[in-house]
Amino acid sequence: MGDVTPELQASFIRAATWHGPLEEAESMLGAHPGLAVASIHTAAILGDADGVRRFLAEDPSAATATAPPYGGDPLVHLCLSRYLRLDRSRTPGFVAAATALLDAGADPNGGFWTTGTYPERETALYGAAGVAHHPELTRLLLERG
């Protein structure tokens, strides 16, 4: 990961997904350009299909690898990405990255449990349909799941 520590990656995942502050994620990318290509998780969050495919070519099991802070896999992180929701110009990259992950064995029904008073299961489908309101990615997950 070069100058990208596991803690920095976890902070980026927190900022770039779900309800995270995207400005913070952008600041981290500016300060640490290697973060964008540090892992399959960061590539997925950014909709970098070529990057996702490179990680899968090196290690196909990366499709199901989990990462802090939530314990999500790359597909779940992709579907909860703030970039997916806020930048529709990245749609082709996100759909291609999701397809590559699914082809490599990612679980279209996968997710993670939140912690707190009322734990909930956050899934890829919830991210695509309920958070990003992304019909193409939602359809892909339903077809595969």
PLM regions: where:
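Ligand-binding grooves and catalytic loops that recognize ribose/phosphate and carbohydrate rings
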Residues: G72, Y83-A100, A104
